[in-house]
Amino acid sequence: EIMQGAYFLTFNFAGLYGEDMWLAGDGREPVADTYRLRCINIIVDHPYHYHAFIQEQLEKRADRYMQICIDQLHMAYMHRYFTQVKLGPFLPTAGTEMLCKPWGERTTDILFTGTYVCPSHFDVFINRNGEEYSQFYHSIIDEVLSDPHALLEDVARRRLTEEIPEATEDELRETLGHIQFLDYYIRFTLRGNVVAALADAGLKVHIIGAGWENLPCSHPENLILSPYASSEECLLALADAKLALNVLPCFHAGAHDRVFNTMLAGAVCVTDSNPYLDQILIDEENVI
C-alpha cells in the first residue's frame, strides 16, 4: 500500500515523465502525483541534459521535488540556472563489490565498459544552421578538447556572450539546455581516441558496449566486442579483468562509478583524473 506523502526515490526522472508502468488512477497520472509523493531524484549526468525535465518538476511538483547531483559542479550549475529547485547534498558515486578473482585466474587483460557513437553522427546538429554556426560549435569543441580542465558549459557561455553581449540570463540558460550534442561529440571523441590508441599499439581491448564496430582505427582486429551486457554482467567482467579503462565523461568534481567498481573488483583502473579524485584518492595507497 502506498501512503500519501511517502518518498519516491528515482534516478534520471524515471517514473516522473509519464511512462505507462508508473501511471495510476482514473486520470492515468504519475503515481508520484496520485499519492502526492515527495520525490527525490538523483541525476547521474550533467543537468544540461535535463533542462526540460527539471522545468517540468518546477511546474508540476516544485514543493515535493528534491534533486541530488553526483558532481559538485553539477550542483553549482543548478544553483546558477535553477535557483528554485531544492537540492539535496552532494552524493558521490560508489561501487559494488562482486566476486574478486585471484590475479592469476583473470582472463581479460584490458576491459572497457561503455558505448561508442562516432562523433560524425552529431554533424547533422553541428551543421544544420550553416557554416557560421558550424565554425562556432567547433570552436567550443576544440577549446574543451584542448584543455582537460575546461567546462563545456563555461566555454559555451563565454563564447555565446562574446557573440551576443546582450544575451540575458534566461536566454543563456535556454541555450545551454541544447548543447547535449557538443557533450556527446567531446565524450565519444575522447573515449574513441583512448581505445583506438591501445588497439593501434597492438593491445587487445575487450569492450562491453554497443557501437564500437564503427570506431575508426588501424587495427580493429584488436577490439574484442561484446555489444550488450547487464549491469551485473559488467561487474562480473570487471572481476575477471586485470585492467579496466575509464574516461571521465565531463565530470570535474565527481566521478563515474566505473572507477570505484573497478577498484572494488580488484582490477587496476586506468583513468584520467580531476580535483575531486585527487582529493579522495591517496598516492601510493590506492592510486599511483
How should each PLM-predicted stretch be described?
Residues 1, 57-61, 85, 185, ...:
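Catalytic binding pocket for nucleotide-activated donors in carbohydrate/polymer assembly enzymes
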Residues 1-83, 96-100, 226-227, 231-233, ...:
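Extended catalytic core of nucleotide-activated donor transferases of GT-like folds
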Residues 36-165:
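Catalytic core of nucleotide-activated saccharide and alditol-phosphate transferases
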Residues 104-239:
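Conserved catalytic-core segment of nucleotide-activated headgroup transferases in glycan assembly
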